[in-house]
Structure formats: structure tokens, C-alpha cells
Design a protein with these regions (language model features):
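C-terminal or mid-to-C-terminal helical accessory/interaction module adjacent to the motor/catalytic core
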Residues: 89-97, 101-115
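Short acidic, glycine/proline-enriched helix-loop-strand junctions
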Residues: 82-87
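Acidic, metal-coordinating catalytic cores used for nucleic-acid/nucleotide bond scission
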Residues: 40-44, 63-73, 94-97
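Short secondary-structure boundary/capping segments
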Residues: 30-32, 76-78, 105
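Phosphate-handling DNA/RNA-contact segment within nucleic-acid enzymes
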Residues: 1-55, 72-73
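Short, aromatic/basic amphipathic alpha-helical patches
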Residues: 71-81
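Acidic beta-strand-to-loop metal/phosphate-binding motif
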Residues: 16, 54-68, 90-91
Length: 115
């Protein structure tokens, strides 16, 4: 599943991350629209369609910055666009994990994405 099942989007968008600790870190530091997929292999069109049913327009995909994470982000982006979601792949950089971002980094990310 995607967790939490219902989240309040910011400007019609949610952030999709890989793990629960990534989601909790972003949420705790001000990005309350973060959801996690519990691993990149758990994402499919049915799960992404639920977002569309909740009137969410877009998904900002923030997976790990390594090659595997970015490849998975591209796969999820393809699936999300097939169900009609507008997507962005936000690459934080090589070896940067959304679960390890400091408060100021999360604030800067929020401004970059939604201001």
C-alpha cells in the first residue's frame, strides 16, 4: 500500500518516497504531503490510481540518488503518467537519501517544489 492512505496535497501534489523513515523525516520537518511506497517494487498502476481518485494531480518522486533509486523513479514515473498523474523526478544527488535530510534542506526543498 501507499502510506498514509490519505494525505493533504500541497498545490495538488504529493511526494512519493521509498521508505517509512524517508516519509517520517520529510513530514516531521514540514513536508506534510509525503507518502511512502514501502520499496520501489510495491508500486503499480492500481495503487497510483487511488491518488487520482483523491483528486491528487501530481506526484513528486523522491527516491534515493543512487543508480538503482533513479531507475526505480523512472519506472514509477512511467506508471504514474499512465494513470494521468503529472510527475516530477526530484533527484537529490548521488548517495543522498530523503530520510537523512536536515531541517533546512527540507525547507529548501519545499520552497523549490511549491513556491
Amino acid at each position: 500500500p501507499l502510506y498514509p492512505a490519505s494525505v493533504k496535497p500541497i498545490k495538488g501534489r504529493v511526494i512519493l518516497v521509498e521508505g517509512i523513515f524517508d516519509m517520517v523525516n520529510l513530514f516531521d520537518k514540514g513536508l506534510s504531503n509525503a507518502i511512502c511506497c514501502f520499496g520501489t517494487n510495491n508500486v503499480n498502476e492500481d495503487k497510483l490510481s487511488i491518488l487520482k481518485m483523491q483528486d491528487i494531480m501530481g506526484v513528486d518522486i523522491i527516491f534515493d540518488g543512487d543508480d538503482a533509486g533513479q531507475k526505480a523513479a523512472e519506472n514509477v514515473r512511467f506508471l504514474a503518467e499512465r494513470v494521468g498523474l503529472i510527475t516530477r523526478n526530484v533527484n537529490l544527488g548521488q548517495n543522498i537519501d530523503p530520510g537523512s535530510l536536515a531541517e533546512q534542506q527540507v525547507k529548501n526543498l519545499k520552497e523549490k517544489l511549491y513556491d
